[in-house]
Amino acid sequence: MKQLRLEPVVQVRGEINIPGSKSISNRALLLATLAQGTTTLTNLLDSDDIRHMLASLKQLGVEYRLSHNNTVCELAGLGGVMSSKQAQTLFLGNAGTAMRPLCAALTLGQGEFTLTGEPRMEERPIGDLVDALRQLGANIVYLKNDGFPPLTINATGLNGGDVEIVGDLSSQFLTALLMVAPLAKGSVNIHVKGELVSKPYIDITLALMAQFGVKVINHHYARFEIPAGQHYVSPGKVLVEGDASSASYFLAAGAIKGGEVKVTGVGRLSIQGDVKFADVLEKMGADIEWGDDYIIARGAPLTAVDLDMNHIPDAAMTIATAALFAKGTTVIRNIYNWRIKETDRLAAMATELRKVGAEVEEGNDYIKITPPAVLNTAQIDTYNDHRMAMCFSMLAFADCGITINDPDCTSKTFPDYFVQFASLKV
């Protein structure tokens, strides 16, 4: 197993241009596929999750051209649904942002489609989405365990009508349903059961759908109306914002050991909720400066916070390791959906924080973190989870440094993360 030793860093300073957002990249690729016309996507993320989506689209007959560095994609839209005369099997790795939307989109056309992935994907729930699609007439069969991939879709199109979907586990289910609803055979009314998690991710979806010319009526996130007879139309060009979750590591670095760290590609005009991570750092005591397309974090003594972070679940992980450098006990609440991500992130985070000496209380949907007087060095297991590796890079700011096991797992969203991270050292 590959290991990366991060020696203690005294201070950081610099500027990082953040790679494209995973959430926006895969949503935009799918909408461009369903749209009339050719779309040029710029600042597309070049990572495993995007490659799985692109490979699947190519297998389904979608034509596109990538630039030499894979960050510009010119894609010819199908002007409607994806169909296939031959049965197709699509391998989607551990990419939830490809599995969930494709599962929904493939019900719109004609054909037999089997969706598979890595072993961890078989543990990541999809039942709430499948239940909703079945209410609209979809024929979907589980191949192993009910509620989980792999699965086969026997597609004949999707009916309109009223549909209920559970909202308190993952916003990706609602995102997938929203994106396919305009191409159903009639108007769709989506009723959300329970409290909707990660609302800002739904805002991303709605903003992109509007960019492609589709109207959705949002009734306070409890009900969504999607009128019939709509079509996606390419806006011509789509600029993929920098990934706000990826920005969180560099902003935290500035807050803990700045100096001054500036991230570009994301700022106050962002459609991503994870930019609110900077507000949490500010509550902890960091000096934050906002521009339209940049954020600057400057170091200051940090103090613990006790906050509901349901709206920024991915970026909230960075607060868990930043808490090791804050005075007092930090509590991160309402984060049950950490448990259904690339790994059970609540359990993994608690385990690894304890290795460096933190006192940790792991609840069903919260985590309490009290830093030790002196942090220990340790070998951090990353659970094939890109965010675990990036979060624990913050331990380079301890006097003892840290060793990251399997650092290449960052290829899921940020292949050269550790190169960029090293560039901040003073």
Curated annotation (Swiss-Prot):
GO terms for biological process: amino acid biosynthetic process; aromatic amino acid family biosynthetic process; chorismate biosynthetic process. The gene is aroA. InterPro entries: Enolpyruvate_Tfrase_dom, Enolpyruvate_Tfrase_sf, EPSP_synthase, EPSP_synthase_CS, RNA3'P_cycl/enolpyr_Trfase_a/b. GO terms for cellular component: cytoplasm. NCBIfam families: aroA (TIGR01356). It catalyses: 3-phosphoshikimate + phosphoenolpyruvate = 5-O-(1-carboxyvinyl)-3-phosphoshikimate + phosphate. It comes from Shewanella oneidensis (strain ATCC 700550 / JCM 31522 / CIP 106686 / LMG 19005 / NCIMB 14063 / MR-1). Pathway: Metabolic intermediate biosynthesis; chorismate biosynthesis; chorismate from D-erythrose 4-phosphate and phosphoenolpyruvate: step 6/7. The active site is at 314 (proton acceptor). Keywords: Amino-acid biosynthesis, Aromatic amino acid biosynthesis, Cytoplasm, Transferase. GO terms for molecular function: 3-phosphoshikimate 1-carboxyvinyltransferase activity. Phosphoenolpyruvate binds at residues 22, 96, 124, 172, 345, 387, 412. It holds the Pfam family EPSP_synthase. Catalyzes the transfer of the enolpyruvyl moiety of phosphoenolpyruvate (PEP) to the 5-hydroxyl of shikimate-3-phosphate (S3P) to produce enolpyruvyl shikimate-3-phosphate and inorganic phosphate. This is 3-phosphoshikimate 1-carboxyvinyltransferase.
